[in-house]
Amino acid sequence: MSLQSDSGGDELSPPPITKDQVLRLGDERFHPDNVAVVTGAASGIGRATAIALAVNGLTVVGLDVDEAGLDDTVETVESLDADGRAVAAAADLTDDAETEAAVEAAAEEGQIRYLANIAGMQHISPISEFPMEAYDDMTDVMVRAPFLLSKLVMPHVRATDDGVGAVGNMSSVHGRYATRDKATYITAKHALNGLTRSIAAEGEGTLRGFSVSAGYVLTPLMADQIADTAEKRDITEEAVIKDVMLGQARTEELMMPVEVANLFVFGFSSHAKHLNGGDLLFDGGYTKTYE
């Protein structure tokens, strides 16, 4: 597993993304006149997905509250000499007006065909101690915002010349099974799976809905979770990675954000035209095998 530190210390972070790591597909709709809206684009999987889609030629409008992180994403796309481009649209996904304004701004950049609902949050706590404020924040970002964004984006897709497009939702292995101390995250991911199927049911075949369920991915969210879990269970961070996160997996390494981003590239492409209501499960055997 290739890891590095952001600042020369012990903090885990993925290596910088290069063009060679990106799945590149010659899709006729992957060009700068078509827009992909990507949430959580300031870091982690959202940033990697924004970069990968821009490398494939799309105009990507990245949404996040982290303006500095969005600027870094845009600069990375420019440094890679991508065939497409990235545009920052700072927005608080818990604010309907800001979310609506961000979609309107995206529509000014071209035809919106794709939406990647990736923004996420985590809080580690048992149900009996879970703060409802954290529950509200997490479900606002990971359930309500994807629903609202889908509601706003779907008419734009239908207004294109052929009505072809897709909404990709970032689910998780926790959308398939449950572990302790993550009840709200698990609830949200199960809800996203329901939204995915509902989009497929209403998309009339050309507007698809799909989800991506990854195992443990090395993101800032995951790095924080490692520390929180170690504290909650009174074990080392190394034990969290080896035993808690990868203990059931057959591919015994954390995924990198760009590996997940490549699944969104495929899911949005014409190669995935029969991926509708379905889920791309890439978990290293975590949920489908046992000792």
For the regions a language model picked out, list residue spans one by one.
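Short, small/polar-rich loop/turn modules that mediate ligand/substrate recognition or access, typified
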Residues: 204-208, 275-277
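Active-site helix of classical SDR
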Residues: 150, 188
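Short C-terminal tail/terminal secondary-structure segment
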Residues: 2-30, 177, 265, 270-271, ...
